[in-house]
Amino acid sequence: MNIHEYQAKEILRVCGVPTPAGFLVQEDTETSEIAKSLARLGGKVFAVKAQIHAGGRGKAGGVVICRSVEEAIDNTKKMLGMNLVTHQTSPAGQKVRKVYIEAGQSILKEYYLSMVVDRENAKVAIIASEEGGMDIEEIARSTPEKIKKVFVDLSIGISDFHARKIGFELGLSLAQIKQFTPLVKKLYALFVTRDASQVEINPLIANSKGEFIALDAKLNFDDNALYRHPDTLELRDLYEEDPKEIEAAKYNLNYIKMEGGIGCMVNGAGLAMATMDIIKYYGASPANFLDVGGGANLEQVTNAFKIISSDKHVAGILVNIFGGIMRCDIIAEGIVAAAKDIGLTMPLVVRLSGTNYSAGIKIIEGSGLNIVTASELDDAAQKIVKLTRKEI
């Protein structure tokens, strides 16, 4: 689960990590209230920052440095309600419903600092660079040697030497390392106790007073651990999530919206990814990732079809099911019932394999519906691509 920058910074402040003073503006906030809040903030420089769940805001015009109260108010009004398009949003962009305004900071140096789970090493990776800011992704690609990593064993926990090692590799002075070490340990404690999947400070700045301040913050949390953190779940912003993904979650369907034209319904994450790969191989693009799991019932199958077909970009659907625990005849009955229930008219190709697959194929072929069957995934992918291009 993702949260907004302003929410992440509130958590950081509670943990003792310094952040700039700021306040939130929403669509219904009066101009007079914005002016009063800016006056309380003080200073002559302000950062006006669009709050969306996507990176790349700075380069897309979602972060503006303003040098007067009037300029800050004007840019805030322009941002609210706009669709911000970044390299991490869809081509349509994400509507800005909230703006965060911060006091400007004097910046001597920008750093990058983050923590993620390194699955290969089964440890927490502390990742840092002496070149933080908007170009960190390009730096990681072009000069990977500038990205420093230290791994922390969860069974042992973090020690001063982990933070000091990173600090020395960043070229920090001894005085800076004395401040940097407790900051890193606080972030690690946050990462572990809140079941985070990512903690990112970019940039972490050193200011003219010699202090480290989190100028931007990104926190992601493990969805599977949210039951332990009701306070974190309260921070969820459904406006920032795809409505189809929210609907799919109600039926325990793992759905992720994509930008292609062929809808996919598959059981198993690995098989789903292989299905998307072969669709791309034959020149088309998947419209979604949808894993119905190993024991889908009629309700789940029906709602999976409804969710996929509600996407106006979907021109056809490919169903790829391997029957293990899930019997193919049962899933076939569900496919037929669902297709009839929603009045499915777009091309539908079904590939079944595994337990009772012959019986499943007979059910589909005897349904009287215009459903194309395939015995192999390669054949199924070619058929759905041709059908959506009207080549069959």
Curated annotation (Swiss-Prot):
Co-factor note (free text): Binds 1 Mg(2+) ion per subunit.
Describe the subunit structure.
Heterotetramer of two alpha and two beta subunits.
Annotated binding of ATP, by residue: K49, G56, R57, G58, E102, Q105, E110
**Pathway assignment:** Carbohydrate metabolism; tricarboxylic acid cycle; succinate from succinyl-CoA (ligase route): step 1/1
Family designation: Belongs to the succinate/malate CoA ligase beta subunit family.
Residues annotated as binding Mg(2+): N202, D216
This entry's Enzyme Commission designation comes to 6.2.1.5
Q: Which GO terms describe its molecular function?
A: ATP binding; magnesium ion binding; succinate-CoA ligase (ADP-forming) activity; succinate-CoA ligase (GDP-forming) activity
The name under which this protein is listed is Succinate--CoA ligase [ADP-forming] subunit beta
What superkingdom does the record give? Bacteria
Question: Which residues participate in substrate binding?
Answer: N267, G324, I325, M326
Source species: Neorickettsia sennetsu (strain ATCC VR-367 / Miyayama)
The family database entries (InterPro entries) matched by this protein are listed as:
ATP-grasp, ATP-grasp_succ-CoA_synth-type, ATP_grasp_subdomain_1, Succ-CoA_synthase_bsu_CS, SUCC_ACL_C, Succ_CoA_ligase-like_bsu, Succinyl-CoA_synth-like
